[in-house]
């Protein structure tokens, strides 16, 4: 069963995310520092009548990287072509994208950390000199064909900035780290979306959904849709606090946005009694691959001070111990302390 607090997008979510996606700065909630800087850079580019410098967005999934790219295109009054690095398998794939863009257009590449080194090599001159170098043939008869490109803006998005090669990272003129959202920001997002879904949420219900959404709009919208289902079946015209609490409890999402997998991970670290635990050990104990633990389970727990990464492994923080003592979860873990 898929986790309700999964930060990656479910297959069926792509269409409704587009429906609920903000299309202007006025609608876009959160990431205020990034918005402020982007507004300046966009205005400067428009006054100079130049394409924006290349932009890199990085941070956990579901925080609005794709949405920002689309708003930038809208503000620049230009076209945007969207793809993902795994879709660009060979030089011809990249060439097809680059030769079909116009002056000032935006090319958005998601998961750019998954781009192969061979494709990166072709991308470098395109980003720096707006030139495409294509090798035709092989061996001694091989020839390099140079194709001039219109000036464009590449927007890259990644959840794993550390996996980007230095040469690729250095070719982006702007780097923006996406931050987790505050409960207040998420409550506004929930309220905004609930009106678009024609099922208004009471303010306290929006806050209840927001505080269980792990600082992530994608999760907040997913929970809202499921809470809306409970409200619909109960023949209610709006989402109430009582219905939101009931629905979220039924979905297995607790007051802090933790689900069963989070609790299992935290219990495991607490049981180690301050001894660091390696990623491979955690993976074996939870029957999860290391990538899932590192990219999906850990980010929110680390950002909120429940887990600490050390050179020797992961440990539970005092905040984590305190949560378990106060929450009444797995009291047996503390019996011999």
Swiss-Prot record:
InterPro entries: AAA+_ATPase, AAA_lid_4, DNA_helicase_Holl-junc_RuvB, P-loop_NTPase, RuvB-like_N, RuvB_C, WH-like_DNA-bd_sf, WH_DNA-bd_sf
A Pfam family annotated for this UniProt entry: RuvB_N
Annotated region (Head domain (RuvB-H)), positions in chain: 255-337
Binding sites annotated in the UniProt record for ATP: 20-21, 62, 65-67, 128-130, 171, 181, 218
Top-level class of the enzyme under EC nomenclature: hydrolase
Domain of life: Bacteria
Gene Ontology annotations for the cellular component aspect, listed alphabetically: cytoplasm; Holliday junction resolvase complex
Catalytic activity: ATP + H2O = ADP + phosphate + H(+)
Keyword Membrane: no
Small ATPAse domain (RuvB-S): annotated segments: 182-252
Record keyword ATP-binding present: yes
Keywords assigned: ATP-binding, Cytoplasm, DNA damage, DNA recombination, DNA repair, DNA-binding, Hydrolase, Nucleotide-binding
Subcellular location(s) of the protein: Cytoplasm
EC number: 3.6.4.-
GO terms (BP aspect): DNA recombination; DNA repair
Gene3D superfamilies to which the protein is assigned, alphabetical: 1.10.8.60, P-loop containing nucleotide triphosphate hydrolases, Winged helix-like DNA-binding domain superfamily/Winged helix DNA-binding domain
Role, per record: The RuvA-RuvB-RuvC complex processes Holliday junction (HJ) DNA during genetic recombination and DNA repair, while the RuvA-RuvB complex plays an important role in the rescue of blocked DNA replication forks via replication fork reversal (RFR). RuvA specifically binds to HJ cruciform DNA, conferring on it an open structure. The RuvB hexamer acts as an ATP-dependent pump, pulling dsDNA into and through the RuvAB complex. RuvB forms 2 homohexamers on either side of HJ DNA bound by 1 or 2 RuvA tetramers; 4 subunits per hexamer contact DNA at a time.
Family indicated by similarity: Belongs to the RuvB family.
Domain notes: Has 3 domains, the large (RuvB-L) and small ATPase (RuvB-S) domains and the C-terminal head (RuvB-H) domain. The head domain binds DNA, while the ATPase domains jointly bind ATP, ADP or are empty depending on the state of the subunit in the translocation cycle. During a single DNA translocation step the structure of each domain remains the same, but their relative positions change.
Name of the molecule in the record: Holliday junction branch migration complex subunit RuvB
Organism: Sulfurovum sp. (strain NBC37-1)
């Amino acid at each position: 069963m898929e986790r309700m607090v999964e930060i990656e997008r479910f297959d069926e979510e792509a269409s409704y995310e587009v429906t609920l996606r903000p299309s202007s700065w006025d609608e876009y909630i959160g990431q205020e520092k990034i918005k402020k800087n982007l507004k300046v850079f966009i205005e400067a580019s428009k006054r100079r009548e130049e394409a924006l410098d290349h932009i890199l967005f990085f941070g956990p999934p579901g925080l609005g990287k794709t949405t920002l790219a689309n708003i930038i295109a809208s503000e620049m009054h230009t076209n945007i072509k969207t793809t993902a690095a795994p879709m660009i398998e060979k030089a011809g794939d990249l060439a097809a994208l680059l030769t079909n863009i116009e002056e000032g257009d935006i090319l958005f590449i998601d998961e750019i950390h998954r781009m192969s080194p061979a494709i990166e090599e072709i991308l470098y001159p395109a980003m720096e000199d707006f030139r495409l170098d294509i090798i035709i043939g092989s061996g001694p008869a091989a020839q390099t064909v140079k194709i001039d490109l219109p000036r464009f803006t590449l927007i890259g998005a990644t959840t794993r900035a550390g996996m980007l090669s230095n040469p690729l990272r250095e070719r982006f003129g702007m780097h923006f780290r996406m931050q987790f959202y505050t409960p207040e920001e998420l409550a506004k997002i929930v309220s905004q979306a609930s009106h678009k879904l024609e099922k208004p949420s009471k303010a306290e219900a929006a806050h209840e959904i927001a505080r269980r959404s792990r600082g992530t709009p994608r999760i907040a919208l997913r929970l809202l849709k499921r809470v809306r289902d409970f409200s619909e079946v109960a023949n209610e015209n709006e989402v109430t606090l009582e219905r939101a609490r009931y629905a979220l409890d039924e979905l297995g999402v607790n007051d802090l946005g933790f689900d069963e997998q989070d609790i299992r991970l935290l219990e495991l670290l607490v049981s180690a009694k301050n001894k660091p635990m390696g990623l491979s050990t955690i993976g074996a104990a939870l029957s999860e691959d290391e990538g899932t633990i590192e990219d999906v389970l850990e980010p929110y727990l680390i950002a909120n001070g429940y887990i600490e990464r050390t050179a020797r492994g992961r440990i539970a923080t005092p905040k984590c111990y305190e949560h378990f003592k106060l929450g009444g979860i797995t009291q047996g873990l503390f019996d011999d302390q």
